[in-house]
Amino acid sequence: MSLESFDKDIYSLVNKELERQCDHLEMIASENFTYPDVMEVMGSVLTNKYAEGYPSKRYYGGCEFVDEIEQIAIDRCKKLFGCEFANVQPNSGSQANQGVYGAFLKPGDKILGMDLSHGGHLTHGSKVSSSGKNYESFFYGVELDGRINYNKVEEIANITKPKMIVCGASAYAREIDFKKFREIADSVGAYLFADVAHIAGLVVAGEHNNPFPHCHVVSSTTHKTLRGPRGGIIMTNDEEFAKKINSSIFPGIQGGPLMHVIAGKAVGFKHNLSDEWKVYAKQVKTNAKKLGEVLINRGYDLVSGGTDNHLVLVSFLNKEFSGKDADIALGNAGITVNKNTVPGETRSPFITSGIRVGSPALTARGMKESEFELIANRIADVLDDIDNSSKQEKIKAELKELAHQFIIYDKAMF
């Protein structure tokens, strides 16, 4: 029996979500459109198989084929990032980070990460996260120019003496200097951990410098700029570290891995290894730069004054309206973004003084500079007259027509 026949409620909602994704312009920087073949393998019989352990070292029988699948995913991941060891089992980026901490740290150890309000991530030591509850966390941020001051990071590291320094961000538009971070880590005897969840797709295409060989350990998600399934990975060049990481993931924080998702990761990695991927990643950066240029020309402030990657962070510290106001208004105009804190934040995390806008998903739909120029101008049109609902409706209709020129899925399930 088909899903449509058996469960009309879920079938209907899934297809409404397809309609939303097709009609709206998805510009949340952490979201992307994965490949139909990734979704196809995730809907396969692999979802039935338990496979606790690792390839050739399982606690269940009948794993001969999933062993091969996981090994393919591991090998492709290592080739992508140019590393020696990879764990492809983490169910998410947050669990990957939890696995890293479990492998390298003891409860109460000190970590130094990027402040959440300056572009960091919850799992980099925020007090509301287990990373901030289990470990003593300290933070670095950005200067008034919106950029990391590595001399200031070094000063903080020398004062706090962390056991681990975390580099990487969820809302930082500039390139990260992993080499400089390693110099700082070495100066205080700390491990260097890079969370490249947001920039991984650029890294593997050569559009952002690689955390290897500078970092002791690297984590990432497999969605976002990699366009694979939702999940996490951990990588290192050190065999002893790899053993600790494996134990930290299983049996440390996870049981049986999601083999259908690991297969999806393998398929996604094959896309990432292609020549077409390099073209895509380059276009992601080009589109983000065009987006930023237009917004600046329209009078909007970008944190750091531009972008080196896939996102721009727009600050409304000098505006009467908030990030939440902008999020809602743009949503009414058919543009999906997210409210975001900015350096110098004066509002609560539920209101914020900025928005984060990304290019990966629309680039996946085939849009280029001309489309991004148009969209950026429409974003500015909405923000210039933020309470004008009739203008928002008019722009929504215009952008729906644009979206329908770049349909990425013709059905909701594969």
Swiss-Prot record:
One BP annotation, GO: tetrahydrofolate interconversion
Annotated catalysed reactions: (6R)-5,10-methylene-5,6,7,8-tetrahydrofolate + glycine + H2O = (6S)-5,6,7,8-tetrahydrofolate + L-serine
GO molecular function: glycine hydroxymethyltransferase activity; pyridoxal phosphate binding
Cofactors, names only: pyridoxal 5'-phosphate
Site residues, Plays an important role in substrate specificity: H223
Signal peptide: none
Subcellular localization(s) per the UniProt record: Cytoplasm
UniProt xrefs under SUPFAM superfamilies: PLP-dependent transferases
Annotated keywords: Amino-acid biosynthesis, Cytoplasm, One-carbon metabolism, Pyridoxal phosphate, Transferase
Classification via InterPro entries: PyrdxlP-dep_Trfase (IPR015424), PyrdxlP-dep_Trfase_major (IPR015421), PyrdxlP-dep_Trfase_small (IPR015422), Ser_HO-MeTrfase (IPR001085), Ser_HO-MeTrfase-like (IPR049943), Ser_HO-MeTrfase_PLP_BS (IPR019798), SHMT-like_dom (IPR039429)
Entry GO CC: cytosol
Transferase found in the keyword field: yes
Binding site for (6S)-5,6,7,8-tetrahydrofolate: L116, G120, H121, L122, E240, S348, P349, F350
Main location: cytoplasm
Pathway named in the protein's UniProt entry: One-carbon metabolism; tetrahydrofolate interconversion; Amino-acid biosynthesis; glycine biosynthesis; glycine from L-serine: step 1/1
Subunit annotation: Homodimer.
HAMAP family, sorted: SHMT (MF_00051)
Protein task: Catalyzes the reversible interconversion of serine and glycine with tetrahydrofolate (THF) serving as the one-carbon carrier. This reaction serves as the major source of one-carbon groups required for the biosynthesis of purines, thymidylate, methionine, and other important biomolecules. Also exhibits THF-independent aldolase activity toward beta-hydroxyamino acids, producing glycine and aldehydes, via a retro-aldol mechanism.
Protein's name in the database: Serine hydroxymethyltransferase
Species this protein is from: Campylobacter fetus subsp. fetus (strain 82-40)
